[in-house]
Design a protein with these regions (language model features):
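Conserved adenine-nucleotide phosphate-binding loops and their immediately adjacent elements
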Residues: 1-25, 29-32, 113-115, 200-202
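Phosphate-binding P-loop
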Residues: 35-42
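Conserved Walker B catalytic segment
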Residues: 44, 124-186, 193-199
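A short helix-turn-beta junction within AAA+ P-loop NTPase domains corresponding to the substrate/partner-engaging
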Residues: 194-210
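Conserved small helical "lid"/interfacial subdomain of P-loop NTPases
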Residues: 207-237, 244, 255
Length: 255
């Protein structure tokens, strides 16, 4: 968790909110993600929303706070955030290595070598990735991958083909892997447009990210700063932000 002083300007109009103290609302969505992690059959999720609606911030905040929502048997899960627009994720092997790096960061120390070793196979190709995920299942660990900007993979159909997606779907169906995938359009619609035939794109559950509720918008407009005990904006400025922003998180923070 982030500690220390709040920033002078608590509003983050462009980019992802990284300080959890500045994240507001989305309680229903956060609960929905956590509830689908629990149980013997985790359900993968597609988070769908327009640009600047807060998909990245939601995923990142969930990764920081999921233990507060799952509560029981938290040692079963390893939850990571992975922005797919990064250069490292432009090839299939690059994707697997980025996932491995994120997971290994959460299982450090000699006591956890049995969890580390499956991810150190070279090359970490499709088969090695599958074997590592299945080995973790045998050891009682569920990787939960929060994949941001999923459209980035779809730009490279020669690198990420139906076989890649079918393999992910197989791991999901065997309850060895859970994905939380953020995209601007629903995955099954994207698949039709881009002519992907994999059943991966018929993902288990879809959450549509919309504007904030009125109460959440008010809470956002009242965020404090490092230099004040109260809200960063005056009462008049808060009112203007709420009217102009129309409950849209990007607009509310662009005042």
């Amino acid at each position: 968790m982030t500690s220390g002083a709040l920033p002078d300007n608590p509003f983050v109009a462009a980019g992802m909110i990284e300080d959890p103290r500045l994240f507001v609302g989305r309680k229903d969505e956060l609960h929905a993600i956590a509830s689908r992690m629990k149980g013997d059959q985790p359900t993968s999720i597609n988070i769908v929303g327009e640009k600047h609606i807060g998909k990245s911030s939601l995923l990142y905040y969930f990764v920081l706070t999921w233990q507060q929502r799952v509560l029981h048997n938290t040692s079963r899960y390893v939850v990571i955030y992975l922005p797919l627009r990064g250069v490292d994720c432009r090839t299939e092997t690059g994707f697997y290595e980025a996932v491995a790096e994120g997971l290994l960061n959460h299982v450090q120390g000699w006591q956890q070598r049995s969890l580390q070793n499956p991810w150190k196979t070279k090359p970490l190709n499709r088969q090695a990735f599958s074997d590592a995920v299945k080995e973790w299942k045998q050891q009682g660990k569920l990787p939960v991958l929060c994949l941001d900007d999923f459209e980035s993979l779809l730009k490279y159909p020669d690198k990420f083909d139906n076989g890649f997606y079918d393999n992910l779907r197989s791991l999901m169906d065997s309850n060895a892997l859970m994905l939380v995938v953020a995209s601007r359009k629903q995955l099954d619609i994207v698949a039709n447009v881009d002519h992907f035939g994999s059943s991966f794109f018929n993902i288990g559950h879809t959450i549509y990210l919309k504007e904030l509720t009125t109460d959440e918008a008010i809470e956002l407009s009242r965020l404090p700063t490092r230099s004040t005990n109260g809200a960063a904006l005056s009462v008049d400025e808060q009112s203007h932000a709420q009217q102009w922003g129309d409950r849209h998180p990007y607009k509310l923070q662009s005042i």
